[in-house]
Amino acid sequence: MTTPNAMPRKTNPLRQQVLGALIKTKPTVWTHKRIDPESPDPRKPRVIETKVHGQEFTGLARNVSEENVDRIAKRWIK
């Protein structure tokens, strides 16, 4: 006969939602502008625009470090 401690525990759905919100990211694109050092007219330099693609944390994820998210995940999901 198994004891209650040996049985696997169910994970709390609210905690799963919180963890999901803490690791949520969305794709972002922004424009990086820089001045061309070889532009012919120094008074009116050419501007080089480069699009940068990346990931951005959203909502709760912006306010919590990855280390703290790992700690919470280890504690809540065993």
From Swiss-Prot:
InterPro entries (UniProt xref): Gp63
Protein name: Gene 63 protein
Pfam families xrefs: GP63 (PF17471)
